[in-house]
Structures are given as C-alpha cells and as structure tokens.
Amino acid sequence: MGSFNRRDFLKASIAGAGLLATAPRLLRAAGPVAHFNGADIVELGKTGIKVSRLAQGTGFNGYNHSSEHTRQGKAAFDRLLRHSLDEGISFIDMADLYGSHPFVKDVIKDLPRNKLSLLSKIWPENASWVKSSGGAKEEVDRFRKELGTDHLDVCLIH
C-alpha cells in the first residue's frame, strides 16, 4: 500500500465533507422511510403463500441434525419460538440439517395450522449425517410426520 501524503489527506477530507453535507438532501429526495412490522402478513413473491414479514429461524450454526437453537435444549427453544409466535411472527424456517422439526412440532401442535407458514429444507447430497428417505417426496413426507402437519408451505433445497 502506498503512502498517504498531506495532499491526498486533504482531498479525501474534502470529498468526505462534501458527501456529509449533501447526505440529508439525498435522503430527503429518496422519499419517506417505510416502517414495517415483522408480524405484517405479506405474500411470498407471487406464490400466493402468506407469511409474516419476518421468519423465526431455527438453525443458527446448524449441522449434524442440531443447531445453536436446539443445542440450548427444549425449554430454551420453546421459549424462543413461543416468544416469536406471541409477537406475531408466524413464519418458521427449519431444516432437516438443524434437527428442529421435533422441537417445532411440540410448540405448534395446538395452534391453528392456517395461522402458520412452515418452511423446511432438503439437503441435496448424500452425506453421513443425512437421513435419506429415498427422494424428495419421501423427505417431505418424513418432514410432515416429524412436524405433525399435513403440509409444508415452502420446501427449499438447502
């Protein structure tokens, strides 16, 4: 990296000051800032699927059928998910890789299914930790059983 002389310092300082001076004007020109609530129900793209604007993830640092959420134990996981649901976050993001299906099942079992949006993910490759059921349809069927639900709203390839 080259040296930074006095002339370069002054140029950079003047450019920075100019940017700071014009920033408020640029922000006003952009229009009002939209305020959103994470619990707002919105359409997921053009799918017709209704989800809360925010989703509760269940797989931070997920691997080998566990995640930071599930490794904290059932009571902590339940508190986290119930808090999100109490706040109106009804979109739940899971994956076989995270081992979260049984944890989620226990929390949602008495909730109206039409008030939830469930997303899970299939791992596309064979690996020692994959519980392969034979194919995508079989995987989704297994996920539905693990969750105690008749359908998933969204299923992704992880």
Outline where the language-model segments fall.
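A short, structured active-site edge motif that brings together acidic residues
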Residues: 114-128, 155-158
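Short gly/ser-rich anion-binding loops that grip negatively charged ligand groups
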Residues: 90, 94-97, 125-133
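Glycine/proline-rich, positively charged
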Residues: 64-65, 72, 130-158
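Short, compositionally biased strand/turn segments
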Residues: 25-30, 128-135
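N-terminal binding-site loop/beta-alpha segment at the start of enzyme catalytic domains
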Residues: 2-116
